[in-house]
UniProtKB/Swiss-Prot annotation:
The gene is alr. Its cofactor is pyridoxal 5'-phosphate. It comes from Helicobacter pylori (strain HPAG1). One of its GO terms (cellular component) is cytosol. This is Alanine racemase. One of its GO terms (biological process) is D-alanine biosynthetic process. It catalyses: L-alanine = D-alanine.
Length: 377
């Protein structure tokens, strides 16, 4: 039984389909790290991870310690990498929970080494190389090779992997992405020349997987990190139009009509004066608001699907509730409303909502609140 009259519906079959799409593209002997940060981009990290592991994922990737600890409590043996920054104070929890950490400096590695020695355990780390994202990482140069040698000499650490991140592999012209891979491959080869090898070498996110697996840029990679494509979205609209891979929608935001009321002509609906009734108006109230992830700016801007009919979202979205206009709509209290999701039900999908807000589908789905129950079909 639902605890609220609003929820996120997650299509399990679509999650499986999208993971299979990844497997059909990457080399047959490749390892796959399913990226499940931000509550699996809104799909629910535990259940999504369970599905990906069933389908053959070798590793799980998250952004922060709390996400990793949540997964570890359900998957005691699964390799989990924290792709984001891990503060030094987190070292003991990383070690005690057998989590892998991203490292980008000798100073950070030294602290982790000291903590590992103190606990008499080993900490797995993946070294981050900055090839053009200009966010975190060691530069791919001779100085960094010397730094890596020093890190490898530290006791208590297991240098399990090395990776970089592509910043715009979804661009129509792949020059920058290919230059990033050229720099990364050259750096890996320099390390190999000095007998420095890594169990895992990775660079490709969803955009890289969808657009760069047909060349030789990935010749030294053996691990791939799909993220947004697992949840049914292409990294950009341009890639959606040009990519032959079919991805299926996973996430739908739904709510029930909790009350229908008739509002006379000449009234304002909701906070402020953002919707004026120029006729007698049938208003449906939904128990869903911007605290749940339905952006406030969507009021008066989108249509939602009710019984395969389109109804306007009116007024400003409140923190916990919103309004739909039901004039000429066949609906009753308790009926389901699709705010966004499956196109077959005439609803907008998350990428269309994102376009209205001048953002991307990543933000639309990953900001769906945890207070919304995830319902898996």
């Amino acid at each position: 039984m639902l605890k609220r009259a609003s929820f996120v519906e997650v299509n399990s079959a679509s999650l499986r389909h999208n993971f299979s799409a990844v497997k059909s593209i990457v080399p047959k002997d490749a390892h796959i790290m399913a990226v499940v940060k931000a509550n699996a981009y809104g799909a629910g990290a535990i259940k999504a991870s369970e599905i990906f592991l069933q389908e053959g994922a070798n590793y799980l990737g998250v952004a922060a310690l709390d996400e990793a600890l949540e997964l570890r409590s359900h998957f005691p043996k699964t390799p989990i990498l924290i792709l984001g920054y891990s503060p030094n104070a987190n070292a003991s929890m990383l070690i005690d929970n057998d989590l892998s950490a991203m490292v980008f400096s000798l100073e950070q590695a030294e602290v982790f080494s000291q903590m590992a020695l103190k606990s008499q355990k080993r900490l797995k780390v993946h070294l981050k190389i900055d090839t053009g994202m200009h966010r975190l990482g060691l530069e791919p140069n001779f100085k960094s090779i010397e730094t890596i040698k020093k890190i490898r000499a530290l006791k208590g650490l297991e240098i399990e992997g090395i990776f970089t991140h592509l910043s715009n592999a979804d661009a129509k012209i792949k020059t920058h992405a290919k230059n990033q891979m050229k720099a990364f491959n050259a750096f890996l080869e320099q390390l190999l020349d000095q007998k420095i090898e890594f169990q895992y070498r990775h660079a490709y996110n969803s955009a890289g997987i969808l657009s760069l697996c047909n060349g030789n840029e990935n010749r030294l990679l053996n691990l791939y990190r799909p993220g947004i494509m697992l949840y049914g979205f292409y990294p950009s609209n341009g890639m959606k139009e040009s990519c032959p891979t079919i991805l299926k929608n996973v996430i739908s935001l739904k709510a029930q009509i909790v009350q229908i009321r008739s509002v006379k002509k000449g009234e304002f609906i909701g906070y402020g004066e953002h919707f004026y009734t120029n006729e007698e108006t049938l208003v449906g109230v939904l128990a869903l608001g911007y605290a749940d992830g339905l952006m406030r700016a969507l009021g008066n801007r989108i249509q939602v699907a009710i019984n395969n009919q389109l109804a306007p979202l009116i007024g400003k979205v409140c923190m916990d509730q919103c309004f739909v206009k039901l004039n000429d709509i066949q609906a009753k209290e308790g009926d389901e409303v699709i705010l966004f999701g499956d196109k077959s039900a005439r609803a907008n999908d998350a990428s269309e909502i994102a376009a209205l807000l001048n953002t991307i589908a990543y933000e639309t789905i990953s900001t769906l609140s945890k207070r919304l129950e995830r319902v898996y079909i």
